[in-house]
Structures are given as structure tokens and as C-alpha cells.
Amino acid sequence: MSLSIDVTSLPSISSNIFKNESSSTTSTLSGKSIGRNEQYVSSDIEAFNKYMLSKSPEDIGPSDSASNDPLTSFSIRSNAVKTNADAGVSMDSSTQSRPSSNVGCDQMDFSLTKGINVSASLDSCVSISTNHKKEKSKKDKSRKHYPRIEADSDSEDYVLDDSDSDDGKCKNCKYKKKYFALRMRMKQVAMQLIEDL
């Protein structure tokens, strides 16, 4: 498996900070030649210290740390070097047939040299029972049915309705007849008092 990344026009950090070690290898995959030009960049501790000390604390922000370890962060940032479009790896061309320019640029290439084998097995048993007993809800059990109580009046002008009761709080209760009788009596007493005055 081969991975080719072409990176162009990335900003270059001053070249005296890095120690460059280059190696060129050629490998064969499926009968096709793949040319590789790999650039290994290692950070210089003294140059890193100078770089960090030259910046004011206000200028150091989240972009200056790709890791909690400053030296690792500096090494990660050092990979963002100026590169050439010719650095890409072609499956159909070899190192000799590929044009290259070594002036003013670094060539970067990535190769996957380790294979990762993932084997995962999941044994699970799911049991679904479709037998469902219909149970009465608690609401139905707690509901009690009371007999409806009808109240009648002896007088013809006596009307039992809830329109003038206290917001319908006295609906079909056993004291309804007594309540209306008492209210009618209180009305009569009040009217008699008004007439006497």
C-alpha cells in the first residue's frame, strides 16, 4: 500500500533550525517501480530554545503547540516545509523517469511500512419474547364508579343547575338538594330584611 501526498507552497521555517538527513529508496509493488525520496527532519534543541525565547509571551498561542510537549510540537511543525509538486510518488513511473528539482525545495513523501491487522468477533444472543399479557393499568384499577345522584326540588320554580354554583364545585353531590334549599331560604330572609328596612 502506498500513500502519496503532494504539498505545495507551504511556508518554510528558517532552514538553520533543522538538521536534514536524506535517504532515497526504491521499492517494488505489483511489478511497478516506486521511487521514494524521504526527508527526515529532526529538531535542534538549541535552535528550538532560541526560537521560543525570541517570541514574546503574547505571541505564543494555540497554533504554537500541536502537542503538550513543546519539543514535540516544534518537531511536528518542522514537517511543514516548502515542497515541490514533483515529490509525489507515481505508480507508473520510476525514479529515473520522474523529473526532480533539488534547488530551493525539500521533497516529502510518506510510506506505510507497518500493516495493521484487526480481528474482532462479537458473539451475542438476543432473545425477544412476543408473549404479552394484557395488564390493566393502575389508572383503571384506581378509578371507582360512583352512582349518579339526582336531586329534585318540591317547588316548581326551583331549578337545579350548576350555572350559578361555586364554579361547578357542587356537581351531583349528596348535599346538593340541601345546599340549594338553604340558599333559597337565605335569599328569602335577605329580601325580607331589605323590605323591612
Curated annotation (Swiss-Prot):
User: Pfam families, from UniProt?
Assistant: Rota_NS26
Q: Where does Mg(2+) bind?
A: D92
Which protein are we looking at? Non-structural protein 5
Q: Keyword check for Transmembrane helix, yes or no.
A: no
Q: How does it assemble?
A: Homodimer. Interacts with VP1. Interacts with VP2. Interacts with NSP2; this interaction leads to up-regulation of NSP5 hyperphosphorylation and formation of virus factories. Interacts with NSP6. Participates in the selective exclusion of host proteins from stress granules (SG) and P bodies (PB). Also participates in the sequestration of these remodeled organelles in viral factories.
HAMAP family (UniProt xref): ROTA_NSP5
Transmembrane stretches in the record are none
Functional note: Plays an essential role in the viral genome replication. Participates, together with NSP2, in the formation of viral factories (viroplasms), which are large inclusions in the host cytoplasm where replication intermediates are assembled and viral RNA replication takes place. Orchestrates the recruitment of viroplasmic proteins such as capsid proteins to these factories. Participates in the selective exclusion of host proteins from stress granules (SG) and P bodies (PB). Also participates in the sequestration of these remodeled organelles in viral factories.
Q: Where is this region: Disordered?
A: 16-36, 130-167
GO MF annotation: an example: nucleotide binding
The UniProt entry's sequence similarity note says: Belongs to the rotavirus NSP5 family.
Q: Name one GO cellular component term.
A: host cell cytoplasm
* Feature: compositional bias, Acidic residues: 152-165
Output the PTM entry.
O-glycosylated. Hyperphosphorylated on serine residues, when in dimeric form. Phosphorylation by host CK1 is required for the hyperphosphorylation of NSP5 dimer.
Give GO BP annotations, semicolon-separated. viral genome replication
Q: Identify residues that carry Phosphoserine.
A: S67, S153, S155, S163, S165
Q: Which cofactor does it need?
A: Mg(2+)
**Top-level taxon:** Viruses
Write the record's keywords in alphabetical order, separated by commas. Glycoprotein, Host cytoplasm, Magnesium, Metal-binding, Nucleotide-binding, Phosphoprotein, RNA-binding
The record's subcellular location field reads: Host cytoplasm
Residue ranges under compositional bias (Basic residues)?
Answer: 131-146
| Principal cellular location given in the protein's record | host cell
